[in-house]
């Protein structure tokens, strides 16, 4: 079986995604770091099970310029993992690391697994950080995504940020409409109303019979219990 993760604590007051109240325990962080390695080293981590195998892990058809091939594969991977394009210095560092791993292991796939593990262990992946630039479109994309989807921005949202469509009212409205139609909006609908209206407290309350003579729960369809 799979051992349970250490508890990921919610914010004690207000909504559970308030950044100034969230913490990541050293125990949970260590578990995430080990997980990034164990997934990539799993015997089930194969071409048939991994959607980006051909684009990222597969041996290149033309290995003449290995460094250029690694760079080409890392750019979109890092963009999704870090929720914005990597700075040149950061990208260069991962390219050098991957190149060294491929050479030392004599295996392109093995080297790319190691660099993927390193990326998934980075604070830039594990933590959300706000840019000091007020008009950073990628920071806005992350805020929208985590607010409405409870998850990282997808490729389409990052592309909208890249193209500057989040910087004007018409473009932002178009993006928001697309996000609201996406199935991932169900996460928001499940969590926000319950937290906003404090339904957990309502379900735990016991109505006073004298004040609430007509209160009852249909035992055959207890809707309040399935919230």
Residues covered by each model-derived region:
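Low-complexity, glycine/serine/threonine/alanine-rich intrinsically disordered linker
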Residues: 1-227
């Amino acid at each position: 079986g799979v051992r349970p993760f250490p508890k990921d604590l919610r914010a004690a007051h207000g909504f559970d995604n308030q950044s100034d109240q969230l913490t990541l325990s050293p125990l949970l962080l260590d578990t995430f770091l080990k997980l990034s390695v164990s997934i990539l080293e799993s015997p089930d981590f194969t071409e048939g099970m991994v959607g980006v195998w051909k684009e990222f892990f597969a041996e290149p058809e033309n290995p003449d310029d290995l460094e250029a091939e690694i760079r080409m594969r890392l750019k979109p991977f890092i963009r999704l993992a870090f929720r914005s394009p990597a700075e040149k210095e950061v990208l260069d560092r991962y390219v050098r690391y991957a190149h060294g791993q491929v050479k030392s292991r004599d295996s392109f796939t093995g080297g790319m697994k190691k660099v993927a593990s390193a990326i998934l262990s980075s604070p830039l992946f594990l933590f959300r950080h706000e840019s000091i630039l007020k008009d950073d479109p990628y920071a806005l994309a992350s805020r929208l995504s985590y607010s409405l989807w409870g998850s990282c921005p997808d490729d389409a949202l990052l592309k909208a940020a890249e193209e500057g469509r989040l910087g004007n009212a018409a473009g932002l409205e178009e993006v928001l409409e697309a996000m609201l139609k996406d199935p991932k909006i169900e996460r928001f609908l499940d969590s926000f109303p319950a937290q906003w209206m404090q339904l957990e407290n309502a379900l735990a309350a016991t109505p006073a019979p004298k004040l609430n003579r007509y209160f009852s729960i249909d035992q055959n369809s207890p809707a309040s219990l399935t919230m």
